[in-house]
């Protein structure tokens, strides 16, 4: 039975390699940076406005310039999602936790499964958090287990697939926030109808099962792996220097952070006790308060 299982796994792995290698070459050759998509889509919309709606070129440019900053608040919210997620992932508490989790990876297969699952969980919590946690965890595992580094990094970023069904999904949280740009058309839609809806949770659970298994099946054959020198992934030691002046001691003191953090915790408890729902502002505020205690 064991030989049959091993043989079927190798067969699946070979088929996945046959499918994935042409796709990898296609993406490497033809997939540009996201900025290029922004420019192309902007030009396509401008052309459509002139061809379909009959607007002149200068009228289209005028509308584009006038509306350029209308999404400034939304852009700031997205920036805070990324910044707070990055800061949380970079805290010593999270880094120590990732190092301990990396000790559980006793084999290359386990390493791929583990980094995929951790990346999925972190991305579901916050997509900015997941982007950084996945990369840091892949480095932590590569320092301890000899595993194909290409697949390890790909697995670390594959968890990003669940971000829009997670707690920091931009559209679900945006339409749950009063005053969003499309409130006049669709109203305010609470997260119990989007993020926490049964169909969305089913998809997320299915991805938590499928993505690690697919990544595990894509492991290259022996002799085809690409390894990285663990010494290149060593984390620099950051010295914790105590303040020598009153200003530096105040800056390094946790007391002020804990006091303002306590006010933030009190507000969050009051908000959710009053049947408050998740919104972009609440998620960002929650991460900011958590950062004050880490």
Spans of features found by a protein language model:
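Single conserved hydrophobic/aromatic residue that forms the stacking wall/gate
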Residues: 1-12, 293
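Lipid-exposed faces of alpha-helical membrane segments in multi-pass integral membrane proteins
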Residues: 40-48, 114, 118, 202, ...
């Amino acid at each position: 039975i064991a030989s049959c299982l091993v043989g079927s796994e190798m067969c699946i792995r070979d088929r996945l390699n046959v499918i994935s290698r042409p796709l990898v070459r296609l993406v490497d050759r033809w997939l540009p940076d996201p900025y290029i998509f922004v420019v192309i889509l902007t030009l396509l919309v401008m052309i459509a406005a002139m061809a379909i709606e009959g607007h002149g070129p200068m009228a289209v440019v005028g509308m584009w310039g006038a509306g350029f900053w209308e999404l400034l608040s939304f852009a700031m919210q997205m920036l805070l999602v990324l910044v707070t997620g990055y800061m949380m992932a970079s805290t010593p508490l999270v880094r120590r936790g990732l190092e301990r989790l990396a000790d559980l990876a006793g084999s290359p297969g386990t390493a791929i499964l583990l980094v995929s699952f951790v990346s999925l969980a972190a991305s579901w919590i916050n997509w900015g958090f997941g982007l950084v946690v996945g990369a840091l965890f892949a480095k932590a595992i590569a320092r301890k287990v000899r595993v194909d580094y290409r697949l390890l990094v790909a697995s670390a970023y594959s968890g990003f697939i669940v971000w829009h069904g997670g707690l920091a999904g931009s559209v679900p949280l945006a339409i749950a926030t009063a005053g969003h740009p499309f409130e006049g058309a669709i109203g305010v839609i609470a997260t119990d109808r989007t993020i926490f809806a049964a169909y969305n949770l089913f998809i997320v659970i299915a991805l938590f099962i499928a993505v690690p298994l697919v990544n595990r099946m894509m492991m290259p054959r022996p002799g085809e792996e690409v390894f990285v020198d663990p010494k290149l992934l060593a984390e620099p030691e950051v010295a914790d220097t105590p303040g020598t002046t009153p200003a530096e001691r105040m800056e390094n003191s946790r007391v002020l952070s804990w006091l303002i953090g306590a006010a933030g915790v009190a507000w969050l408890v009051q908000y959710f006790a009053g049947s408050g729902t998740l919104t972009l502002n609440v998620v960002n505020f929650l991460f900011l308060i958590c950062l004050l205690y880490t």
